């Protein structure tokens, strides 16, 4: 087995270092897994990860968000809780963000070059601002809105 020293491998190493330096396990683990996959026999599975990775990630994220409700750590509010302005605002924001993310997916497919910018912005946000890497979908939706694609 020989190492493939290319631009992508270098980027993954830089991300790995940034993840360690910024104490961000999400970036560190993601970059390490992808670097290992790229440099080994697992590279044949990268297209599968590319095709289903976001969907699987969203499923896992949704399970993580819903699990406190299922475990009983978070209780459903009574009817008056649903009628408060904070609940109405939170539902509205949830709808807006989901709609924006849905509009971002087609933009990412139509103009894949923009994905690079979105990823760089997401990496900066995760590595240095304590963000979470669900940003590309929402960022693409906001970008689609700004570009007049919506």
Swiss-Prot record:
Main localization of the protein described in the UniProt heading: membrane
Q: Source species, please?
A: Haemophilus influenzae (strain ATCC 51907 / DSM 11121 / KW20 / Rd)
Recorded GO cellular component terms are: plasma membrane
Membrane topology reported for the UniProt record: Multi-pass membrane protein
Where, by residue number, does the polypeptide cross the bilayer? 1-21, 52-72, 81-101, 123-143
By what name is this protein known? UPF0756 membrane protein HI_1074
Cellular location of this protein?
Cell membrane
The family note in this entry says: Belongs to the UPF0756 family.
């Amino acid at each position: 087995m020989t190492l493939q020293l290319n631009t992508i491998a270098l980027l993954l190493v830089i991300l790995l270092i940034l993840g360690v330096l910024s104490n961000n396990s999400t970036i560190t683990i993601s970059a390490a897994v992808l670097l290992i996959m790229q440099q080994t026999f697992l590279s044949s599975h990268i297209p599968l990860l590319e095709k289903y990775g976001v969907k699987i990630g969203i499923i896992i994220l949704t399970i993580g968000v819903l699990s406190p409700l299922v475990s009983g750590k978070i209780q459903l509010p009574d009817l008056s809780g649903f009628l408060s302005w904070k609940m109405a605002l939170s539902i509205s924001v949830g709808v807006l963000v989901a709609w924006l993310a849905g509009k971002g997916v087609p933009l990412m497919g139509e103009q894949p070059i923009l994905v690079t910018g979105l990823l760089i912005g997401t990496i900066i946000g995760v590595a240095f601002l304590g963000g979470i890497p669900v940003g590309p979908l929402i960022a693409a939706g906001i970008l689609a809105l700004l570009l007049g694609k919506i």
